[in-house]
Amino acid sequence: MNQTLMEIKERALSQINASDTLDALNEIRVNFLGKKGELTSVLKSMKDVAPEDRPKVGQLVNEARESLEEALESKKEAFGKVLREAKMKAETIDVTLPAKKPMLGHRHPNTIALEEAERIFVGMGYEVVEGPEIEYDYYNFEALNIPANHPAKDEQDTFYVTSNILLRTQTSPVQVHVMEQGKLPIRMIAPGRVFRSDEVDATHSPSFHQIEGLVIDKNITFADLKGTLAEFAKQLFGEETKVKFRPHHFPFTEPSAEVDVSCFKCGGKGCRFCKGSGWIEILGCGMVHPRVLEMSGIDPEEYTGFAFGVGLERIALLKYEIDDMRLLYENDMRFLKQF
């Protein structure tokens, strides 16, 4: 029996070492350790062994089985290693090869226009200040001398969150917050998103951007306002640009004006771009109303100031000759990659 076990073990180990595929290895496992395998048959014949020899023979059979199982597992792991190495070699990526470049975005016209405007005003000593887009009714209207019965407060024009909280319709509330801090003098601009209940078309959107400006100091006059906006227009549209102030009305400024610039396409001669007038409207402005100063805790007898507001999209549309505001929000790369 001992001799038979040794022969079976040596033959099995020899076949295991010579095997070159997993299928061959599995076949060896079945032939020697399966239900009808040679080693299993020896185990079944234990009934024919003398009782006193059974423990010894049983031990030898178990040792042979353990030896074969260990050899089979070791060979299986070797096959697995070879397969993994072959797979890794087949899937190897040459990192030195030139990669496909990802699609790059482009700077948005609004971003370019905002950075240009900020550069101009910061160069004149202005500070850039931001404020909340969700605002109290008081800061959006009453603190700006817009009474409770003013048409602008109508729900058809304003997005209300509650009866006294709304989406700001202008960035002017930022000016009020700054004035309430009482740190004078003030020289600031407040760029940001605003919201109005407008239908979407070529020139309107329910969400757009404004840049509001404010200067508060002693002895500020309308001449300071004119000089500031004239310089802004020249830096934005060119040194030959002229400005024209037309009387207007805003609740928070007195006197108030709308500002036109000479058409930078035709030099003021009249063309399709300026609709033949030679002038293009760009912003509204005026001297800060004394009541607005009072409500923010500033003495209008000692301090005066001016304010102005310009639509950021308006600047982008003019500078880049875009005829439809909706193009700014459609995220069409064919359009945006031009900038």
From Swiss-Prot:
One of its GO terms (biological process) is phenylalanyl-tRNA aminoacylation. Its cofactor is Mg(2+). Transmembrane segments: none annotated. Binds 2 magnesium ions per tetramer. Pfam families: Phe_tRNA-synt_N (PF02912), tRNA-synt_2d (PF01409). One of its GO terms (molecular function) is transferase activity. The keyword tRNA-binding does not apply. Keywords: Aminoacyl-tRNA synthetase, ATP-binding, Cytoplasm, Ligase, Magnesium, Metal-binding, Nucleotide-binding, Protein biosynthesis. Disulfide bonds: none annotated. Mg(2+) binds at E254. PROSITE patterns: AA_TRNA_LIGASE_II. It is an enzyme of class 6 (ligase). Signal peptide: none annotated. Belongs to the class-II aminoacyl-tRNA synthetase family. Phe-tRNA synthetase alpha subunit type 1 subfamily. Tetramer of two alpha and two beta subunits. This is Phenylalanine--tRNA ligase alpha subunit. It comes from Lachnoclostridium phytofermentans (strain ATCC 700394 / DSM 18823 / ISDg) (Clostridium phytofermentans).
